[in-house]
Regions:
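All-alpha prenyltransferase/terpene-synthase fold signal
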Residues: 13-349
Length: 349
């Protein structure tokens, strides 16, 4: 029977749960990164023919930041103390991500990925297509190891995400032949191409931890906003980054006239003279790389594009933090996830 103490007991129970969560052992992102790499290194490839599976193993062995699996494990670790339990689904998402890179490299005819020869150059284009297709299936096979009760929501989310990423890639390709791409269209394209997989990884981690639906959804929104900030920062670093830190040559987007947030806004905000000069540099003519990158960067400086992009990054980062604030957990549970996203964005706090 209900008594005046009923509410009090309920509150005490809730507080004791929160207290337990506070005292749990949290893994650092560095520890989780090491676990992901060790797990990937030990994955067996026992099927034949070897020529189909060697490129898959090769692509996954090239390293990388492992952002998506680490985010999934950090998300799970908000509620549960055994992130090792979900290493296979975390690696499934990393397998899928690397499959998209394998096919991207083929579409771009890229020579290098993470300082190593790309699959279609090391083997050939047909191998890259077939191994890539198989890699997508392997990602599903690895994801299907999650417990039966959670399998349906996880597969539904992952499948929707995979479709969205394909849509984002197609939009990106379509934009190459258009001169009227708007800022909103560009933001939607990078949301689909980049953000949704970060969001998906975070939400799957929450689902597998048995988190409340509202918290899982808040983490998805957090990932979406952080993903937008992350991609815009990539655009910015392509122009203003240090090549040593950035890991690739500066000005790649400028050289191929890629419709980035920066170029779209430069055209929108340029005066007649600046627009004419931008159009000249973005025409099909062959230009000296150094000369073209310097000229377009100077135009960006004149128009104030760097500050504009930095403000937009700040906006999405702040929006993301608001969604993380909404996750109903003690603040100390979120410290590691906050620190990791700050590190992703190369921020001190």
């Amino acid at each position: 029977r209900w008594s005046p103490n009923h509410k009090k007991k309920k509150l005490e129970l809730k507080n004791s749960r929160i207290k337990k969560l506070k005292n749990k052992d949290m893994k650092t992102s560095d520890e989780l990164y090491e676990k992901v790499n060790a797990f990937i290194d030990k994955l067996p490839y026992n099927r034949e023919p070897k020529s189909l599976y060697e490129p898959i193993q090769y692509v996954l062995s090239l390293g990388g930041k492992r952002i998506r699996p680490v985010l999934m494990l950090l998300s799970y670790n908000l509620w549960k103390d055994d992130p090792e339990r979900i290493l296979m689904p975390a690696v499934a998402v990393e397998t899928y991500h690397n499959y998209t890179l394998l096919h991207d490299d083929l579409m771009d005819n890229a020579d290098k990925r993470r300082g190593h020869v790309t699959v279609h150059k090391k083997w050939d284009a047909n191998t890259a297509i077939l191994s890539g297709d198989s890699m997508l299936v392997v990602a599903y096979q690895r994801l299907a190891t999650v417990e039966q009760a959670k399998l349906k929501p996880v597969l539904e989310l992952f499948t929707e995400t995979a479709l969205e990423i394909g849509e984002g890639q197609q939009f990106d390709m379509d934009f190459e032949n258009r001169n009227d791409v708007t800022e909103d269209e560009y933001i939607e394209m990078i949301r689909l191409k980049t953000s949704v997989l970060l969001a998906c990884a975070l939400k799957i981690g929450a689902i597998l931890a048995g988190a409340p639906v509202s918290d899982a959804e808040a983490l998805y929104k957090f990932g979406e906003q952080i993903g937008l900030a992350f991609q815009l920062q990539d655009d910015l670093l392509d122009v203003y980054g240090d090549p040593e830190v950035f890991g690739k040559e500066i000005g790649g987007d400028i050289m191929c006239n890629k419709k980035t947030y920066m170029l779209i806004n430069a055209f929108n905000r340029a005066n007649a003279e600046q627009k004419k000069e931008l159009q000249k540099w973005c025409s099909g003519e062959k230009f000296d790389r150094k000369e073209k990158v310097a000229a377009v960067t100077r135009l960006y400086d004149e128009i104030g594009i760097r500050q504009l992009c930095e403000a937009k990054i700040e906006h999405y980062f702040a929006e993301g933090k608001k969604w993380l604030d909404q996750v109903a957990l003690p603040e100390e549970r979120k410290v590691e996830l906050r620190a990791y996203t700050n590190q992703m964005m190369k921020r001190e706090n």
